[in-house]
Design a protein with these regions (language model features):
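Transmembrane beta-strands of outer-membrane beta-barrel pores
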Residues: 1-2, 107-109, 118-122, 194, ...
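Flexible, surface-exposed loop regions and adjacent strand-edge segments
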Residues: 6-15, 129-139, 231-241
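Extracytoplasmic gating/loop element in the C-terminal half of outer-membrane beta-barrel translocons
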Residues: 64-66, 120-215
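Repeated loop/turn-to-beta-strand initiation elements of outer-membrane beta-barrel proteins
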Residues: 109-113, 204-205
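Membrane-embedded beta-strand positions of outer-membrane beta-barrel proteins
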Residues: 114, 216-218
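Outer-membrane beta-barrel "beta-signal"
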Residues: 247-253
């Protein structure tokens, strides 16, 4: 926890750094996506014009439309700006808990060793390290499944709030790429770091063939991982927008 911080007195308490955790996130608070009911819509087709209804908070950028991210107006002034960011949202970017545990067992020369490692109490914001850009197709069962991932977005035909991506834009649109709780993810993980199974031949048996010791084994490293991000190796964090090369799965015999 930050006990003292040399900061200009803030207008609102949620902007205060003092009392927050180290490496915490300062984010806009997403309040779902804009819907057609938030606008007065005139015209047809490509000539449609959108005007926010009275009482509906404006976006972080001009020209918001249905499907863009809507943010909570924390200070109630009817607009979204830096005063609506909140300190210490989610968990810190650096894990507060790092752990490992394992098991070793042996019986009549046969043995097995297994080791897990993981982290907890940590969050990441997708795209935070790369100006809002990230590549969600590097990892897991959806690896390289660009088509299925891009389909998980808001469209007029699928005006769902339960999508990964808001309305698509042909260029970077600050309203939708700003660091916010829309992109906040639990970054905890548990990894099966390594497992080894083998057999130590008995000395009595080996003496018959002139060998002092012999062991055969199969070892695997970085075999699997359980996490909530599922787009890139969680142990590497959110650096480089997901383009960092994952830890290799290896086998040794």
């Amino acid at each position: 926890e930050i006990l003292e911080y040399d900061q200009v007195p803030q207008v609102y308490p949620w902007l205060e750094k003092k009392g927050t955790r180290l490496n915490s996130w300062k984010l806009y608070i997403a309040d779902g996506l804009y819907t057609a009911d938030d606008f007065n819509i005139t015209g047809e087709g490509l000539n449609r014009q959108y005007e926010l209804k009275s009482g509906v908070v404006s976006g972080l950028s001009s020209g918001v439309r249905p499907g863009d991210i809507k943010y909570k107006d924390l200070n109630g002034d009817g607009k979204i700006d830096s005063n609506d960011q909140m300190e210490d949202v989610g968990n810190p970017s650096v894990p507060e808990i790092v752990y490992g545990f394992g098991l070793n067992a042996e019986w009549k020369g046969a043995y097995v060793g297994i080791f897990f490692q993981g982290s907890g109490n940590t969050s990441t914001v997708l795209g935070a390290s790369s100006n809002g850009a990230f590549f969600p197709f590097q990892w897991g069962v959806e690896e390289s499944a660009v088509r299925s991932e891009v389909a998980n977005r808001w469209t007029e035909q699928n005006p769902s709030q339960n999508v990964m991506f808001p309305r698509m834009h042909s260029t970077n649109y600050d309203n939708n790429t700003a660091a916010s709780t829309w992109w906040l993810r639990n970054a905890r993980f548990l990894r099966l770091k390594n497992i080894e199974v083998g057999y130590n031949f008995k000395e009595k048996t080996l003496k018959k063939i002139g060998i002092q010791a012999l062991r055969v084994y199969l070892q695997g490293n970085n075999l699997c991982v359980w996490d909530d991000i599922k787009m890139w190796d969680p142990e590497l964090g959110n650096t480089n927008g997901g383009f960092s090369y994952p830890l290799s799965r290896t086998f040794t015999f």
